[in-house]
From Swiss-Prot:
<keyword id="KW-0325">Glycoprotein</keyword>
<keyword id="KW-1152">Outer capsid protein</keyword>
<keyword id="KW-0479">Metal-binding</keyword>
<feature type="binding site">
    <location>
        <position position="212"/>
    </location>
    <ligand>
        <name>Ca(2+) 2</name>
    </ligand>
</feature>
<dbReference type="GO" id="GO:0039621">
    <property type="term" value="C:T=13 icosahedral viral capsid"/>
</dbReference>
<feature type="disulfide bond">
    <location>
        <begin position="174"/>
        <end position="227"/>
    </location>
</feature>
<protein>
    <recommendedName>
        <fullName>Outer capsid glycoprotein VP7</fullName>
    </recommendedName>
</protein>
<feature type="binding site">
    <location>
        <position position="189"/>
    </location>
    <ligand>
        <name>Ca(2+) 1</name>
    </ligand>
</feature>
<feature type="glycosylation site" description="N-linked (GlcNAc...) asparagine; by host">
    <location>
        <position position="221"/>
    </location>
</feature>
<feature type="binding site">
    <location>
        <position position="214"/>
    </location>
    <ligand>
        <name>Ca(2+) 2</name>
    </ligand>
</feature>
<comment type="similarity">
    <text>Belongs to the rotavirus VP7 family.</text>
</comment>
<feature type="glycosylation site" description="N-linked (GlcNAc...) asparagine; by host">
    <location>
        <position position="52"/>
    </location>
</feature>
<dbReference type="GO" id="GO:0044166">
    <property type="term" value="C:host cell endoplasmic reticulum lumen"/>
</dbReference>
<dbReference type="InterPro" id="IPR042207">
    <property type="entry name" value="VP7_1"/>
</dbReference>
<dbReference type="GO" id="GO:0039624">
    <property type="term" value="C:viral outer capsid"/>
</dbReference>
<dbReference type="Pfam" id="PF00434">
    <property type="entry name" value="VP7"/>
</dbReference>
<feature type="binding site">
    <location>
        <position position="284"/>
    </location>
    <ligand>
        <name>Ca(2+) 2</name>
    </ligand>
</feature>
Amino acid sequence: LWNYILKSITRIMDYIIYRFLLIVVILATIINAQNYGVNLPITGSMDTAYANSTQSEPFLTSTLCLYYPVEASNEIADTEWKDTLSQLFLTKGWPTGSVYLKEYADIAAFSVEPQLYCDYNLVLMKYDSTQELDMSELADLILNEWLCNPMDITLYYYQQTDEANKWISMGSSCTVKVCPLNTQTLGIGCLITNPDTFETVATTEKLVITDVVDGVSHKLNVTTATCTIRNCKKLGPKENVAVIQVGGANILDITADPTTTPQTERMMAIIWKKWWQVVYPVVDYVNQIIQTMSKRSRSLNSSAFYYRV
């Protein structure tokens, strides 16, 4: 009888131990799992996700960056204008030191590795009919969250898996050429050994978002001395960024997929004449804009932010 009881206790203990070890293994697998795209070993960093802000005064513990072209400060021509603007934001509840004014030279310069430092980021972008495509690409870049890996185009062929997969090039001068390949890795309408026969998709640009036929391998040629190219996956809207289009008769459509409804959600429009007439409405409506955004979020909900002033 004693041996039977001892064996029963041993079997029960073994069962408990094995179940515990199984649970530990499963949890360890889940915790250490990486988020890979389909055939895309993309490991770039992501911002911490937050829920949409519903606080009445998120600015008391947050930072706001307002990016503006140098043209604005040149026209205003007032050495004290930033202090004035800081005092105006204070009337809306933003403490001194929580609002940062950041100047950029032009759209092309801002397109090269744009850095959005604050909890909330508002980018003033003056409309220019000669730069519509550049503006659309920049807006697509900064209004969305991307996971990217460097590409070694000298060793490998690359293909895009779906509409969210793009190749993003940045630099002082980017010329991008592509050669689609068949299943025998022979060029379709081009010779893989002769870049002059490749199809040119961009010439001497600072920002290029390349979209090719999904599921087809490509040989690429890029001016790597002045440009970097990355294999990127669009995760969804970057909800702590808003682009405020200054002027222009039409809202720019930044939708990459031509079969979908144009992406022009959440727009604000006022008649633009002078830069002070742009700045004043931004101060007036800043809290309403912030309430529709999320603090450092990459939520996959459809809520990209594109405004026009």
